[in-house]
């Protein structure tokens, strides 16, 4: 049974004056690809990341350090407004570092920031379509008949009406929380499988893609916590004739976005084809369960591309092909990706010629 979240009891306390002090909630990626956070009090309004201290936590409790040498450090990397506390309170996305100053093994932002710096003159933009699935606290798909199944896929994608969509109130709350926080969320929609949803983040330039997607995920699981709902980013949470969950990654450089850019898009696709296996290796765990060649996916063992082809590894949208410039969509990434790793390897392959 889920713990009840007492918003009505909490509300009067959130309305109290904070005495000139503010909350800073440090958020980080743990050793298993999940998210953790803890709060510190700051004595002044934070307007720049340099005002925030380097903090630490017990890495032995997050699978990031041994118990005998457990301190892991949090270095602030991006600031967002806090939609849960409001006011001038903030969320602080942080990188993790070992006590010898080296990045923790789960800190993929450190490397990708260097990659993005090398490619900054190309002005790379990304947009990620984050799919996810909602479950009751007992592990049942949210809104599904207990011990049974809803009707087959068909009416749920972008659906409207009772029995076709589930948890729209939660999804709307998350959308508004992202907008308030400053996350560059660009849309939402119900997905093909019932209780599966998608939100889109972007376009974001360079390293900010990973920052904004991770914070959007954090906001989602925090909002879902208030509803007593679990969020799954597993790429194939349910076996059977149900769609998996991906994180389709849209990508372009300035040259691709300008008239005549199709030749640069095609050149990028050729480079991506040559490193298919290297990309698959960082495109999410259990992705072989999703990339089967069915349910709008290409097969994990084969690279393919095409215009408006949702069964391909790389899709070029029809409107992009018609105009002759724009972007490409990499449909291989799973819903549980680390976006820093995905955006980083795309840059390495298409710009840095790794």
Swiss-Prot record:
EC class: ligase
Subcellular location per the Swiss-Prot or TrEMBL entry: Cytoplasm
This enzyme's EC code(s): 6.3.1.2
Domain of life assignment: Eukaryota
Annotated family: Belongs to the glutamine synthetase family.
Subunit organization: Homooctamer.
UniProt protein name: Glutamine synthetase
Origin species: Amanita muscaria
Gene this chain is encoded by: GLN1
């Amino acid at each position: 049974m889920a713990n009840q979240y007492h918003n009505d009891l909490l509300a009067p306390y959130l309305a109290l004056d904070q005495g000139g002090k503010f909350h800073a909630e440090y958020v980080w990626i743990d050793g298993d690809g999940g998210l953790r956070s803890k709060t510190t009090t700051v004595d002044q309004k934070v307007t720049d990341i340099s005002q925030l201290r380097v903090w630490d936590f017990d890495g032995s409790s997050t699978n990031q350090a041994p118990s005998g040498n457990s301190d892991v450090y949090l270095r602030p990397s991006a600031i967002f407004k806090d939609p849960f506390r409001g006011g001038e309170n903030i969320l602080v996305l942080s990188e993790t570092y070992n006590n010898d100053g080296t990045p923790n093994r789960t800190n993929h932002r450190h490397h990708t920031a260097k990659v993005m710096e090398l490619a900054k003159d190309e002005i790379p933009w990304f947009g990620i379509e984050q799919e996810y699935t909602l479950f009751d606290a007992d592990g049942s798909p949210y809104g599904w008949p207990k011990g049974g199944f809803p009707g087959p896929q068909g009416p749920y994608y972008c659906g409207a009406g009772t029995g076709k969509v589930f948890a729209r109130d939660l999804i709307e709350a998350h959308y508004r929380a992202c907008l308030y926080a400053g996350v560059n969320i660009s849309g939402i929609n119900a997905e093909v499988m019932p209780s599966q949803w998608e939100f889109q983040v972007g376009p974001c330039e360079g390293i900010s893609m990973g920052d904004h997607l991770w914070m959007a995920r954090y906001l989602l699981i925090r909002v879902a916590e208030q509803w007593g709902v679990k969020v799954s980013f597993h790429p194939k949470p349910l076996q059977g004739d149900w769609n998996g969950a991906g994180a389709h990654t849209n990508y372009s450089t300035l040259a691709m976005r300008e008239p005549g850019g199709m030749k640069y898009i095609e050149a990028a696709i050729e480079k991506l084809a040559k490193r298919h296996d290297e990309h698959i290796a960082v495109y999410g765990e259990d992705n072989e369960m999703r990339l089967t060649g069915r349910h709008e996916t290409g097969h994990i063992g084969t690279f393919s591309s095409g215009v408006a082809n949702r069964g391909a590894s790389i899709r070029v949208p029809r409107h992009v092909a018609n105009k002759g410039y724009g972007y490409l969509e990499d449909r291989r990434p799973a819903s549980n990706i680390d976006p820093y790793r995905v955006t980083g390897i795309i840059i390495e392959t298409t710009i840095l010629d790794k």
